[in-house]
Regions:
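Short loop/turn segments that connect beta-strands within beta-propeller blades
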Residues: 127-129, 172-175, 213-215, 261-263, ...
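N-terminal secretory signal peptides and thylakoid transit peptides that target proteins
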Residues: 2-18
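Blade/loop signatures of beta-propeller domains
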Residues: 34-44, 53-87
Length: 439
């Protein structure tokens, strides 16, 4: 890896982790001119003729087997507990920090909750009691590198784990036994995505890799890199999405690509790249949040100041806005809910892009002095409310119809992931490695 790649990866990793190392201790000012790395796009304008937000009824999920619940990344309005009574807590292992973030979403399947710690050690817990069922280290015997990136996905009794040690591992979900493992070209940027017999992920050099779920045999591959070969981006990003035989992936280059899931043949590409005009080492265009597919349309947001809806089959733009963000959009019924990098939350009509409401989430620990910037993760929708978590260690519930914060509750620690909702529980992993089940 070149020095340029390492510098850019370090900068982008810092960006994607949402200032994990920030603290209240005063630091001396660094001399020199400050150069913004993200464009200040301003807020999306609420349209006077935008329709009022409507929502579909909440539906219960028995499982949450992969990132954002399913291969399309569109769980919708999920039914969950109406309160936050702690049902159980468990320690998953090593907590996250600036150098080793804890960004793998927990999963629920086969009456087990799966979690991965900052060292990529995987644990399974009873969904009923939180008692540990099995624990497995994925660290190779002679590994010297730190784990950054990766995640998990479940399918047909198997748990698929991508690790920052540059491996994809298939385990028996019931006991953690390794069934097969594949060495990757580079460490992964994403968790695996499973669609039938296909396992797909993206590695750090912007290469999309596929594997046979049963045997681990490598399949087709596709490069999303543009320009300098091997250039890299944000270290931890969202998994590819799948629907109607089409796999959609976002890359560090700002390219959103749709591919035939069977052959890897490109169907279309759209650019979410920045026109910010910085040097290539600073001009960030990464599509960090996972793309979402709903009703034949793909939704994604990039660091290149683009949020766009694209027809899944043709690649035609449905609508586009100028906004920068790292969180996957939340789709529910006829509306998309968008969180931008200024911690503004928007309700956008999915058909035409009209903005129905905008809400400024708290931006700072100290709002008066505007110190201690906050980062919010999410949203996901539970019982018709948008749920977000913060780097201050709070969980917020937002009225999705009106765009107002209904309540906030303190978590046991800061959170860099939104919760998952399945099996009658709300499950939250916090930065200190604590997994909490609410009922």
């Amino acid at each position: 890896m070149t020095k340029h790649m390492m510098r850019r990866r370090t900068a982008l990793t810092t960006l994607s982790l949402g200032l994990l190392a920030s603290c209240s201790t005063a630091k001396p000012k660094i001399p020199g001119a400050q150069v913004p790395v993200l464009p200040d796009t301003g807020a999306l304008a609420v349209a006077v003729d935008a329709p009022a937000v409507t929502l579909p009824p909440a539906h219960a999920l028995a499982s949450w087997p992969q990132q954002l619940a399913n291969a399309a990344h569109a769980p919708g309005n999920v039914a969950g507990p109406t309160g936050l009574a702690v049902h159980w807590t468990a320690l998953v292992g090593m907590g996250g920090g600036f150098r080793q973030p804890l960004l793998a979403s927990p999963l629920l399947a086969q009456d087990l909750v799966f979690a991965m710690d900052a060292n990529a050690a995987v644990s399974a817990f009873s969904v009923a009691t939180g008692h540990p069922v099995w624990h497995a280290s994925t660290r190779p015997k002679h590994a010297t590198e730190q784990n950054i990136g990766g995640g998990m996905a479940y399918g047909s009794g198997r748990l698929y784990v991508s690790t920052g040690y540059g491996e994809l591992i298939a385990m028996a979900a019931g006991n953690g036994k390794v069934l097969w493992r594949q060495k990757l070209d580079f460490p992964p940027r994403t968790a695996p995505m499973i669609a039938g017999s296909l396992v797909a992920l993206i590695v750090q050099n912007d290469l999309l890799l596929t594997f046979d779920a049963e045997s681990g045999t490598p399949g087709w591959r596709f490069t999303g890199a543009v320009g300098t070969p091997g250039s890299t981006g944000v270290a931890v990003t969202g998994a590819p999405a799948f629907a109607d035989g089409i796999l959609v992936a976002g890359f560090a280059s700002g390219t959103l690509a749709a591919l035939n899931a069977n052959s890897g043949t490109p169907i279309w590409e759209q650019s979410y790249a920045s026109a910010f005009g910085q040097a290539s080492s600073l001009d960030f265009s990464d599509i960090v949040g996972a793309p979402v597919i709903a009703k034949g349309v793909v939704y994604a947001i990039s660091l290149g100041a683009t949020v766009m809806a694209v027809d899944l089959h043709s690649g035609a733009k449905v609508w586009t806005h100028t906004a920068t963000g790292t969180q996957a959009l939340c789709l529910a019924g006829d509306f998309a809910f968008v969180l931008d990098h200024n911690q503004m939350l928007f309700a956008v009509h999915a058909d035409d892009g009209l903005v129905s409401w905008a809400l400024q989430m708290p931006q700072f620990h100290n709002m008066k002095k505007k110190t201690g910037p906050l980062q919010w993760a999410g949203p996901v929708m539970v019982n018709g409310q948008l749920v977000l978590t913060s780097s201050r260690g709070e969980i917020a519930f937002v009225d999705a119809l009106q765009g107002r914060i209904k309540s906030t509750t303190k978590l046991v620690a800061p959170a860099d992931l939104p919760p998952i909702a399945a099996g009658g529980l709300l499950l939250q992993l916090t930065r200190n490695g604590t997994l909490t089940a609410y009922s």
